[in-house]
Every structure is written in C-alpha cells, then in structure tokens.
C-alpha cells in the first residue's frame, strides 16, 4: 500500500467507526431506555430501526451524488447532519418530559447523515488505489474499523449510560466532529477523470443494463449482506435483553459480554481482508464458508442454556460473519467501474441497512413466543445466505491474461473482473 495514502485511509476508517458507534453503542442501553421512557420492547427497537429505514431510502441517492459531484462533497455534509441528529436526541432526552418521538426525529436525522457518509467510503477506497490487492487490503481495514466499532460500542455505551442514561446520545456529535476534521484535512481525493459523469437518463439506462448482465451475482451479494446484518443486529438485540432478564448481567459487565462475539468478528474481518487479495475464488468460498459456519453455530445454540457455552457459540458466529463481510465488500467494489462504483456499492449498503432495520423489531416479536425460535430463524437465514454464495457467485478461473476491459464494456459499464 502506498505510504502517502496511509493517512487518507486511516482518516476514512474514522467514518465507519463513528457510524457504528452512533448505532451499536445504543444496543446495551436499550433496556434502560425502555424503562426510563416506559415504552414496549418493539418501540425501543424502533430507535435502531428508524435510523436504518431512512438510510435505506437515501443511500442510493447519496451514491449517485457521489458519482456526480465527488465523494468528499457528500461525506462531510453528511457527517454534519449526523452530528446535528445526535444533538437533537441528547437534548430531547435531557429536557423533554416525554421525549420518545423527538428522539426518533433525531435518529431520523442521524440516518440521513449516515446514508451519505459510511456507504460512500467503499467506492472512495476503490478510487484511491489502482491495484486490486491494495483495494482489498484497504477495504479490509475499513471493514475492520466497522467491526472494531461494534466491539467497543457496547462497552462505550454501557460506560456512558452508567453515568447518565442519555449520555451516549451526546457523544455522537463529538465523534462526528473528530471525523469531519480528519476527513477534511487528511483525505486527498484522487483527481477526477476528464470525462463528464453520465446524465441521469443515461445512468438509469446503464443501470438497467448492468442488472441484465450481472443480476445473478449482484443480487446474491446484496442478499447475503442484508441477511448477515439482519442476523447480527437481531442477535445483538436478543442478547442485550436476555443477558439482563435471564442472567442478571447489566451495565458495563453486559457491555463486555456483548463485545466477546464482536471481537471475534473484528479479528476475522481483519485477517480475511488481508488474505483475500484479488482472488475472487477465495472470496466466494470464504463467503460460503463464513455463512455456513454462522448457520451451524447458531443452530447449536438451541441445545444449551449455559451462558459460557452460549458465548462460545456466538464467538464462533462472529468469526463466520467477520470472514464474510470483507469478501462481499471486495467482490462488489472491485467488480464495478469507477463511474458507477458509488451507486452500486450504495445499493449494497442499503441492503445491509435493510438487515439492520429489520433485525431488532422482528427479533423483539419472536422473543415473546419462543427463545429457541430466535436461533432457528437465524440459522435458516444464514444457511440461505450460504446457498446464495455457493450457487450465484461463480468466478471463472483465469486463463492467461484477464479478459480485456473493452470486451466487457460491450456488455455493461460495470464489471466483476474475473466473472
């Protein structure tokens, strides 16, 4: 990796870290918020879900704008909006007697900001490096930052909430400010090509053409990303409630317990990002193996009520998720031409947010009937993801030189180099 771009990349890692902290550090605090506001488990799950729903709708627009006007011009205003959303939620929780709906409004603003920040990082990393191995390594670092945020977020959230329950809301604008400074001063955007970005009509036409020729692997990757995040956030929501209700684990101790499977996720993500290089066959099989490992480990959880055995199972599940995510990032980023990279990767990010949005409320409903059903559904969803990876992602073996780009361009303005 070019040494002069290390600072750029390190600065970019602050964005997924901030966005993850802004969402995931609330998970261990949700039971406390539920008690303070006197709301149902479904209502408290909406604090996570409303953030994700608005992001789902706006991420593709942010991706298109980043292709048109530039990545940095989308990222910085988005971070500012996220910070404002954090101020709204903090102020509502502090000053208003019945703050639930204003908190949701603040979370809505955070979702708007997140739509234009974290998802645009992926195509920007793709723009910064010409060598696919460096792109994979950079994406692995971004995904590791994302997962590292998930590891520390329950601990940070629990520590802050132990002081006062709404303190986590106030730290979101602080984190955003730090990220804005880093991105503004340290990230150097690659010089734009001379050719003009496509008009919206041409963009829609080429977008349709892309899915005509690449629908199988694109839909597979979108689906796997959504399923993985659905299971991850659903299980985290389940754990946050169960640790408190069934095992009496609360506060900072609960944050530490929640961090255990997320630590496995972070380590696996870092190693996978470093090892996959530009070998798309390896990416396919790691995606398949990680999803299958997740399915098997979660299914085995129905056979125990012991907390230590359960955490061991979830540690293995974290390895499965951490192995899968960097491969999905690399497949979709390296397989798309620069001009459309922002839009397509943003659609992928939208699908991941669909999983984040659906996980907590659906698991909140399932938990009322049968706790084992949580693991049955999680295992089944993960198995479906593994079948998508097995049957729909089919990298061809390279024979001599790579297929020439101009031949691929006859089919589509987007590519998956070895497909």
State what each model feature region is.
Residues 1-2, 188-220, 410-414, 419:
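Juxtamembrane intracellular "pre-TM" segments in multi-pass secondary transporters
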Residues 59-71, 268-281:
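Helix-to-loop junctions at the C-terminal end of transmembrane segments
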Residues 281-328:
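C-terminal transmembrane helical hairpin of 12-TM major facilitator-type secondary transporters
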Residues 141-186:
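Helix-loop-helix hairpin linking two adjacent transmembrane segments in secondary transporters
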């Amino acid at each position: 990796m070019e040494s002069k771009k290390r600072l750029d990349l390190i600065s970019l890692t602050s964005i997924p870290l901030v966005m993850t902290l802004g969402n995931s550090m609330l998970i261990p605090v949700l039971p406390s918020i539920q008690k303070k506001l006197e709301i149902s488990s479904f209502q408290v799950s909406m604090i996570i879900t409303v953030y994700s729903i608005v992001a789902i709708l706006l991420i593709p627009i942010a991706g298109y704008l980043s292709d048109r006007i530039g990545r940095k011009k989308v990222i910085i205003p988005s971070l500012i909006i996220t910070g404002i959303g954090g101020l709204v939620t903090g102020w509502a929780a502090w000053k208003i007697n019945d703050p639930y709906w204003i908190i949701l409004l603040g979370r809505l603003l955070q979702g708007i900001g997140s739509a234009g920040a974290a998802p645009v990082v992926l195509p920007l990393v793709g723009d910064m490096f010409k060598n696919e191995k460096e792109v994979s390594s950079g994406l692995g670092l971004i995904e590791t930052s994302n997962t590292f945020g998930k590891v520390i977020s329950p601990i940070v959230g629990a520590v802050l909430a132990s002081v006062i329950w709404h303190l986590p809301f106030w730290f979101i604008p602080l984190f955003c400010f730090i990220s804005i400074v880093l991105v503004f001063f340290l990230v150097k955007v690659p010089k734009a090509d001379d050719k003009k970005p496509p008009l919206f009509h041409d963009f829609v036409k080429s977008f349709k053409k892309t899915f005509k020729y690449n629908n199988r692997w694109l839909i597979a990757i979108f689906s796997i990303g959504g399923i993985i995040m659905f299971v991850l956030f659903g299980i985290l929501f389940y754990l946050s409630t169960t640790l408190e209700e069934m095992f009496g684990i609360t506060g900072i101790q609960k944050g530490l317990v929640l961090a255990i499977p997320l630590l496995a996720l972070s380590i696996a993500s870092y190693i996978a990002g470093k090892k996959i290089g530009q070998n798309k066959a390896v990416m396919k099989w790691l995606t398949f193996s990680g999803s299958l490992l997740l399915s098997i480990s979660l299914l085995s959880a129905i056979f125990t009520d012991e907390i230590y055995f359960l955490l061991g199972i979830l540690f293995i599940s974290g390895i499965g998720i951490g192995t899968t995510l960097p491969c999905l990032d690399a497949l979709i980023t390296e397989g798309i031409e620069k001009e459309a990279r922002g839009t397509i990767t943003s659609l992928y990010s939208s699908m991941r947010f669909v999983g984040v949005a659906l996980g907590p409320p659906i698991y909140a409903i399932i938990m009322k009937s049968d706790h084992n059903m949580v693991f049955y559904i999680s295992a089944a969803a993960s198995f479906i993801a593994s079948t998508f990876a097995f049957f729909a992602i089919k990298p061809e073996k390279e024979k001599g030189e790579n297929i020439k780009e101009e031949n691929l361009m006859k089919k589509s303005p987007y590519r998956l180099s070895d497909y």
